[in-house]
Amino acid sequence: MIRTHDAGSLRATDAGTTVTLAGWVARRRDHGGVIFVDLRDGSGVAQVVLREEDAHVLRNEYCVRITGEVTRRPEGNENPELATGEVEVTADELEVLSEAAPLPLPVDDQIEAGDDIRLRYRYLDLRRSGPANALRLRSRANQIARTVLHERDFLEIETPTLTRSTPEGARDFLVPVRLQPGTWYALPQSPQLFKQLLMVGGMERYYQIARCYRDEDFRADRQPEFTQLDIEMSFVTEDDVIDLGEAIVSRLWRQLAGHQITRPIPRITWHDAMARYGSDKPDLRYGVELTELTDYLRGTRFRVFAGAIEAGGYVGAVVMPGGAAQSRKELDGWQDWAKARGAKGLAYVVLDAETGEARGPVAKNLSAEHLAGLADAVGAKPGDAIFFAAGAESRAAQELLGAARVEIARRANLVDESAWAFCWVVDAPMFERVSDSEEGGWTAVHHPFTAPNAEWVDRFEEAPDRALAYAYDIVCNGNEIGGGSIRIHRGDVQQRVFDLLGITPEQARDKFGFLLEAFKYGPPPHGGIALGWDRICMLLAGADSIREVIAFPKTRGGFDPLTSAPTPITAAQRLEAGVDARPKPEARAQAGTAGPAAPVADPT
């Protein structure tokens, strides 16, 4: 052993013990012939006292090994900020294991550094306690989840990383196959179809901490490769899966955040979430809610509202407490805020703090009757501001108000940052239009293997826009941290879904033939959930980005500053991999039987 003790483990009870420590020089202080060194390893920091002649060569981040006696610090010199603050090690021997060049990044929790430099020298960044503790927390989260699942007789099973591409879901990352030029593997977007095959195979309780890959456009706080806790169960109902999800999440929050989640976690239907919060992942830490005014404002002459109502659309409002105190510049700034989200603007009325009189551009266009009852209709008080959205499409207007609700909470300091608010969003739509046109076809909101609920299973073709699915998402503080569904296991129902989606038998066979073949042989009823592991760990760590809980994350643009990936390949590599090769006609003819399609992802 290079060392006998961890630096962070030393306590007053170790006084008089001779120890050997190994780690990095976090800090050195010279005191007239004596040098004090803060020695850091993975467990913490211990103070080491060395003679100047022994330690004059030491610099920050040198990797060293010391042997010495643990002694109590002189009275008054204790450091209550450190777990080891009552003791120090008087060194008898010092060995420099390796030297450190001048540092491009300060290894100091008190000094902020830019994201680019932190990612470029991530290995130095991880020596800081904040980033290191985030990864330790993630490791503990993995252990806790595994414990919960093993207590319930789940099997941890790995599924393929190299699979077959399919146009379903997001774009795939593709891998050329050297031994079969012109053919490609795809990296999985999730283990979705493989875990369903495991259910057919009798592996009734499956889980996996799964690596997933999606070639998406650049989006804030997304990574091209990510992790989900993937779960599938046979012979279960929606309630069974939700109960398991709650067991995992409540154990995680109790042990890692010290928070006891009240169970059962509240459930809200998808349509109620959109109507009340303008979002299918509502933040319930504050109580501001949307109000629909379509019926209240029916008959108005204000063209913006009247046009939406006549088109069978939606008019709604959200209240900003104390919003009337905003300056004209601040109120006008809301228009820029709305336009940045693709809207034409955000109409508003402010209520005078003294009289409650409605003022503002919209107030001039509403009748006296509508103005008189407006405050009561939306639950506003004198001094508040009321923001409106209207449109022929209800969802777009609701989502604009939902985004305004979040921004109102931020600007008005309504969010208790120490609070935790969870909910399940259930009864999601089964289908949505491919385009805004009424003639447009249908697509599955989740994926084409999601089961319609009992009310709709025999008649979803009658009104696809109103059909509901056995689908459920779990939300924490406005973040979707997991989602899943009960799957279709009946061949006749699956065929009807394919028919509605415009997937021909040939296309279904080409994309999912192996799954449909498996479903001929007695598939059990089954369902599952995928928990977004990066986001869950981010919340538990109190981090602002999922990058903080990933060992070697990429930038928003998918670039890795540490390795400079992605990089071009050489002409020789390109030739060897067969990147430019064309598949032989026989291979194209056999595409429908070439093997498993790339999985379609649970939303996370």
Swiss-Prot record:
Any one of the GO CC terms: cytoplasm
**UniProt-listed InterPro entries:** Aa-tRNA-synt_II (IPR004364), aa-tRNA-synth_II (IPR006195), aa-tRNA-synth_II/BPL/LPL (IPR045864), Asp-tRNA-ligase_1 (IPR004524), Asp-tRNA-ligase_1_N (IPR047089), Asp/Asn-tRNA-synth_IIb (IPR002312), AspRS_core (IPR047090), GAD-like_sf (IPR004115)
Q: What is its EC number?
A: 6.1.1.23
Q: Which domain of life is it from?
A: Bacteria
Provide the GO biological process annotations: aspartyl-tRNA aminoacylation
Instruction: Report which reactions are catalysed by this protein.
Output: tRNA(Asx) + L-aspartate + ATP = L-aspartyl-tRNA(Asx) + AMP + diphosphate
Q: Name the residues that bind L-aspartate.
A: 168, 214, 446, 487
What positions belong to coiled-coil segments?
Answer: none
Feature: compositional bias, Basic and acidic residues: 577-587
Primary residence: cytoplasm
Site location (Important for tRNA non-discrimination): 31, 76
Keyword terms: Aminoacyl-tRNA synthetase, ATP-binding, Cytoplasm, Ligase, Nucleotide-binding, Protein biosynthesis
Asked whether the keyword Protein biosynthesis is assigned, the reply is: yes
Composition bias (Low complexity) maps to 588-604
Locations listed in the record: Cytoplasm
Region of interest called Aspartate, as start-end residue ranges on this chain: 192-195
Residue segments, region Disordered: 575-604
* Annotated ATP binding sites: 214-216, 223, 480, 532-535
Enzyme class of the recorded protein, top EC level: ligase
- Carries keyword Amino-acid biosynthesis? no
Q: What does this protein do?
A: Aspartyl-tRNA synthetase with relaxed tRNA specificity since it is able to aspartylate not only its cognate tRNA(Asp) but also tRNA(Asn). Reaction proceeds in two steps: L-aspartate is first activated by ATP to form Asp-AMP and then transferred to the acceptor end of tRNA(Asp/Asn).
Q: Which HAMAP family match?
A: Asp_tRNA_synth_type1 (MF_00044)
Q: Which family does it belong to?
A: Belongs to the class-II aminoacyl-tRNA synthetase family. Type 1 subfamily.
Q: What is this protein called?
A: Aspartate--tRNA(Asp/Asn) ligase
Species source reads Salinispora arenicola (strain CNS-205)
